[in-house]
Amino acid sequence: GVAPLAVSEELIGELESTDFLLLATPVNNFTVPAVLKLWLDQVARVGRAFESTPDGKIGKIADRPAIIAVSSGSVFLGEDARQPDFLTPYLTAILNCLGIFDISFIAVQAVGRTPERAWADARAAIAAHPRLSGGTP
């Protein structure tokens, strides 16, 4: 059989070996889909990926750039948002808990209603992002 923490240890090791973290996820019922939540639950392990102290959680994963591409059928960020955004604060909080603070979000919004505009906005956001456009990291 597999040791109880073997999968968790493997996933944490993969994260530790990266120069940057790239996640791509849809908004699913206002937050992350179950498969991403499962990965986060395996990686966010007390005593290994973070320590719990009287002053709060202290991440043990070295900070690295994290770029999170988020797609949504509707608008969830900005002044035109018509639904609450629980995804970006949740991912920010859990990555901060691990020790990752250099976080950027790229949103592809309203793909269900205006896909051409959504993809044009996404391309513009990618072109403006220094790490994705070939600019200085």
Regions found by a protein language model. Give the residues of each.
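Helix-loop-strand module that forms the ligand-binding subsite of alpha/beta enzymes
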Residues: 3-89
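Glycine-rich phosphate/pyrophosphate-binding loop and the adjoining helix
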Residues: 78-137
